[in-house]
């Protein structure tokens, strides 16, 4: 979501529209107002502890955030023409201020609580009740809602009863200048991970969240170790993950769970955990990998798959959500049933042992990704803004 907000704001600002991005302050020493690009600035508003914080507790501080945003706008003499919010927490704030300022609203959920609950495997994975309630209210109250895919749109209509006329389908984009194929030897040297040239690097990029399906990927590695021991000897899974917004205690718990999974499935020696990585370094990791795996149980779109494809890296993804539309099965990679470790292991074997197949999938992946640009996303979003402004005349 951070990538989406950043890249969309940059493109909108480049077209001459002024954009203020309001976010919760997580560091009291950080500059409160920072100019990102021409016409785009980010404002850090204190609300709750000024540190990485459990997102499930942020809801309690939304009134404070709303007051802080209102006070900033008043002090600056700022006036706005539209409020565009992302995720249900920001949507709550946007609705309150838009009512007060009588402004049109656009909202993007990115993920849906009811969809998360549909695939949750434990009570801890379920969305809180206030999220479900607020999402329903936002479906009703927002002027327009952006869906990333037709599947996303259908879920909103079926699960929340939103008026389908409110929804506009606008896919995500990828920075094709940043995410580009890099020669593998150069990429491997740049990332600094000790991988022998003849070894196969498998890549996972994502939050350390059960919904992301890492357990299924570990199970697939375990299957390959039994069925293809010679392949397993020359295979390494690099895990890039960790949420900067997650508090240190919960992140530590995630890492402990990850280590236990590796041990239980006897794949500790096949997995290296790299932690979080800066966005501008990810193309080197994607390009160093022979395949990127996105084994999620739920994805509204799946930006990681698109980034990997833009780097010419084949993708194996779960047949869920927007991944079904982004990844072309048998063309840019493979789709497998979510949670099916056997199917995932079989596709990993095909790609890792098939150099010619890998080469063809890689070429197709890059071509496919070129259809998704942030310039196109911004064009469609600005068209939506113009539609609302015309209605307000």
Regions found by a protein language model. Name each.
Residues 180-195:
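A short helix/loop element that forms part of the nucleotide-sugar donor recognition site in Leloir-type
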Residues 1-44, 393:
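N-terminal subdomain of nucleotide-sugar transferases
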Residues 314-317, 327:
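Short hydrophobic beta-strand element within catalytic cores of glycosyltransferases
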Residues 241, 250-277:
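Nucleotide-activated donor-binding/catalytic signature segment of Leloir-type glycosyltransferases, i.e.
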Residues 297:
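Aromatic "clamp/platform" in nucleotide-sugar-dependent glycosyltransferases that forms part
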Residues 329-330, 334-341, 350-355:
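Conserved acidic donor-binding segment of nucleotide-sugar-dependent glycosyltransferases
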Residues 276, 284-289:
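Short alpha-helical donor nucleotide-sugar binding micro-motif in glycosyltransferases
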Residues 151, 173:
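Carbohydrate-associated surface elements
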């Amino acid at each position: 979501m951070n990538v989406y907000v950043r890249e969309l704001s940059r493109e909108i600002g480049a077209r001459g529209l002024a954009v203020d991005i309001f976010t919760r302050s997580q560091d009291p020493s950080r500059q409160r107002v920072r100019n990102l690009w021409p016409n785009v600035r980010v404002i850090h508003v204190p609300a709750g502890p000024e540190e990485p914080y459990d997102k499930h507790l942020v809801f309690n501080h939304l009134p404070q955030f709303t007051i802080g945003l209102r006070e900033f706008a008043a002090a600056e003499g700022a006036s706005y023409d539209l409020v565009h919010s992302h995720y249900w927490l920001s949507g709550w704030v946007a609705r309150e201020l838009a009512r007060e300022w009588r402004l049109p609203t656009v909202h993007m959920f990115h993920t849906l609580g009811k969809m998360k609950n549909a695939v949750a495997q434990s009570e801890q994975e379920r969305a809180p009740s206030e999220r479900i309630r607020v999402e329903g209210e936002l479906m009703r109250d927002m002027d327009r809602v952006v869906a990333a895919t037709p599947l996303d749109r259908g879920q909103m209509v079926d699960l929340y009863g939103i008026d389908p006329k409110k929804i506009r389908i606008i896919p995500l984009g990828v920075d094709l200048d940043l995410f580009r194929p890099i020669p593998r030897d150069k990429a491997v040297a740049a990332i600094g991970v000790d991988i022998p040239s003849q070894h196969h690097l498998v890549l996972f990029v994502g939050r350390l969240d059960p919904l992301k399906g890492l357990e299924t990927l570990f199970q697939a590695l375990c299957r390959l170790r039994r069925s293809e021991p010679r392949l397993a000897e020359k295979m390494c899974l690099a895990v890039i993950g960790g949420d900067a917004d997650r508090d240190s205690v919960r992140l530590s718990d995630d890492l402990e769970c990850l280590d236990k999974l590796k041990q239980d499935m006897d794949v500790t020696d096949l997995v290296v955990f790299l932690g979080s990585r800066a966005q501008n370094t990810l193309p080197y990791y994607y390009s160093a990998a022979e395949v990127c795996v996105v084994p999620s149980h739920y994805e509204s779109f799946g930006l990681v798959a698109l980034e990997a494809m833009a780097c010419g890296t084949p993708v194996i993804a779960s047949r869920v959500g927007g991944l079904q539309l982004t990844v072309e099965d048998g063309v840019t990679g493979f789709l497998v049933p979510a949670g099916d470790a056997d199917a995932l292991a079989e596709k990993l074997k095909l790609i890792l042992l098939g150099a010619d197949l890998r080469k063809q999938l890689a070429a197709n992946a890059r071509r496919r990704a070129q259809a998704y640009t942030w310039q196109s996303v911004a064009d469609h979003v600005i068209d939506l803004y113009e539609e609302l402004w015309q209605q307000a005349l």
